[in-house]
Amino acid sequence: LKLYNDSFRYLQTDHLDYYLLHSLGRGGLEAFDDRFVNNGMMSLLQADREKGKIRQLGLSFHGNQEQFDELLKLHDKYHWDFVQIQMNYFDWKHADGQRNVNAEYLYDQLDKREIPIVIMEPLQGGRLANPAESVANRLKERDPKASLASWAFRFVGSYPRILTVLSGMVYQEHLEDNLRTFKGFKYLTDEEKEFLGTEIAGIMASFPTINCNDCKYCMPCPYGVDIPGIFKHYNECVNEGEIVQSTGQENYRKLRRAYLVSYDRAITSVRQASHCIGCKQCLEHCPQSISIPRELRRIEAYVEKLKRNTL
């Protein structure tokens, strides 16, 4: 309740146009009840919406299909004014097995109920703005002048139920590129949507990357492991075709040395995967439901094999 009241004080306003319940889904209805129902918060939020103190009440979803369906069943009771979901042309049909729910399903279910949608991760943590060379080449063949990021933004922006698209911009160039994309917005054709959601996403799905979007919710690690940094380095090597498969591979020595040197440069030794003890503290914080300790063990095993020449 204090956090809720402080929001109005910090923002120096007597009302909020959009109030979002963050990160619902994980833990199911039991977690939702503990956070918002049993303490009376949902009753208060509904009452404040009636008074106009909150204009639109919604949620951001992080979970699997069963948890999503449970939350939508509450729509008749609470009337969600908007829902924030992760949606991009890769997750449209290729969401990983742990989250178990494609963005296509999330969108369709919300569209049926006429619930406006806010999009998070339209670039999947930057992955769609900097894909593997083979993917980038295919996109450039279609439109040499279009930025790689613009394809991803146009994909999510071309669906009619979308209320707004979030974009984590770091540099001035990002802002300028986004303005070019959304000013005089060009809707994708059905063929272009299929091209991105099936062909391009299919190529990307063939790369064994880790579905980390660099949100850093898993940090800090109590043992100092740079979890997002390790995953980012590994994914970049996968996308650039720099992962070694066996000692008999062409350019084995060159690729082996390149990975080990770049790993040490990207991640200091005291923060590398070998320092993970499997405490699992990070698991509950990951919105992508990545099995973080397992992936760190896999990377560490790969590094050790490279060092020992035992692939």
Feature names for model-found ranges:
Residues 1-118, 123, 130, 134, ...:
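Glycine/proline-rich, positively charged
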Residues 79, 105-311:
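Structured C-terminal cap/extension of enzyme domains
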